[in-house]
């Protein structure tokens, strides 16, 4: 299966970086073996001297909202004696509640991780924390698609050490490759890399 990818180029030098670096599942694993989602952004790593996948702790509000939704679902299933009786009686309802409880715990751990680690983001390629984050309206995400017909889309981000400006050529490419699952410690250091078929 192929997926669309784009490259980020510099208008002053021959620099190129490909968005497929963001592909594949990336997760933290804590000391108990529990998985926590790992969000990434495409930003500059001073050690790699390239645009690389960098940890992102900017989605905390989204996880807070998801946590509220999971807790609301649990509350809706347990807010009366009759519902509690049927929950006890019917295993399918217990499974659903257990799912929402597990989901809520994952979101709570992710929120804690985001708050604890914000400002200490690391490059997921080399492990360095000497990074320049492109966030907000200066973010380069995997979902970014230039909306320009036949022209390069300049993204208003300067190429460090060069002074050129990054742009995305209007032509998207499709690449087929095996996706990998990468596991990281809570400190952002890679533990293992698993290729998925």
Where are these predicted regions, by residue range?
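Extended, charged low-complexity segments
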Residues: 161-165, 169-197
């Amino acid at each position: 299966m192929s997926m669309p990818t784009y490259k980020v180029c510099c208008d002053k030098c021959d620099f190129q970086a490909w968005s497929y670096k963001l592909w594949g599942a990336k997760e933290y694993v804590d000391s108990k073996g529990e998985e926590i989602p790992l969000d990434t952004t495409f930003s500059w790593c001073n050690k790699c001297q390239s645009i690389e996948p960098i940890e992102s702790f900017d989605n905390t509000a989204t996880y807070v909202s998801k946590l509220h939704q999971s807790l609301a679902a649990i509350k809706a299933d347990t807010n009366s004696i009759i519902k509690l009786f049927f929950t006890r009686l019917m295993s399918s309802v217990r499974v659903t509640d257990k799912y929402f409880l597990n989901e809520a715990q994952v979101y709570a751990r992710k929120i804690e991780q985001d708050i604890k680690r914000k400002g200490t983001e690391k490059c997921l390629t080399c492990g360095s924390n000497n990074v320049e984050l492109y966030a907000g309206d200066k973010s380069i995400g995997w979902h970014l698609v230039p909306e320009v017909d036949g022209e390069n889309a300049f993204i208003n981000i300067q190429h460090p050490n060069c002074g050129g400006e990054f742009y995305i050529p209007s032509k998207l490419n499709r690449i087929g490759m095996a996706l990998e699952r990468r596991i990281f410690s809570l400190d952002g250091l890679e533990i293992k890399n698993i290729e998925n078929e």
